[in-house]
Structures are given as structure tokens and as C-alpha cells.
Amino acid sequence: MSAETENRISVEDLFSSKGRVKVLRELATSSELNISELCRRISLNHSSTKSHLQVLINSGLVEEKVFGRIKIYRYRIEDLRARSLKNFFELWHS
């Protein structure tokens, strides 16, 4: 089994949480955000947001970049699944 296949998250798990969908949608429409700004924009607490981010990082949809003590989260638009989800969000909200 390839690393890409191991990182797959089921659609049910991906959309099982409103908070996770909020994180995905916000990152898909923003370039890069730190966790404080992301929490502010989606109105979730730090702990919940961090938990959702970890699932999304493990799935390969989001990337975490570390600059000293600062962590920046980026939507991996180069991933076909991430690109498809971004298109879905854009169509759904148009």
C-alpha cells in the first residue's frame, strides 16, 4: 500500500464534523494562516481547531510549516482531492 493510499480519509470522516468542514473551507479560500487567525475566522477554540488540523494534515489535505515557534497551515491545492474540494466549496457557495 502506498503512502498516498494510507493517508486517505473517508468522505464520511472528512465531512463528519462541522468544525472540520469550517477549517477546510477557510483554508481553501485563504493562502496560509496561523492557528490563532484560523480560530478567529471560524469561531472555534484552539483545541478543537488543532484536533481538526491534525486529521487534515494526516490525510494530506493540509500542510503545516514551522518557523521557530510559529506554525502556519496551508491548504495543499496541488493535491487533486484538495483541488476538487475547493471547487466543490466554490460551487456550493456561488
Language model features with spans:
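Short capping segments at the starts of secondary-structure elements
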Residues: S30-N34
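A short acidic, leucine-rich amphipathic alpha-helix
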Residues: E37-R41
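Beta-hairpin "wing" of winged helix-turn-helix
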Residues: N58-G68, R76
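Conserved segment of winged-helix/HTH DNA-binding domains
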Residues: T29, K71-S94
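Residues within the helices of the helix-turn-helix
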Residues: R25, I35-S36
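Key DNA-contact positions within bacterial/archaeal DNA-binding proteins
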Residues: S47
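Short alpha-helical segments that sit at the start of domains
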Residues: M1-K22
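Short, hydrophobic-biased segments on the C-terminal half of alpha helices
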Residues: L53-Q54
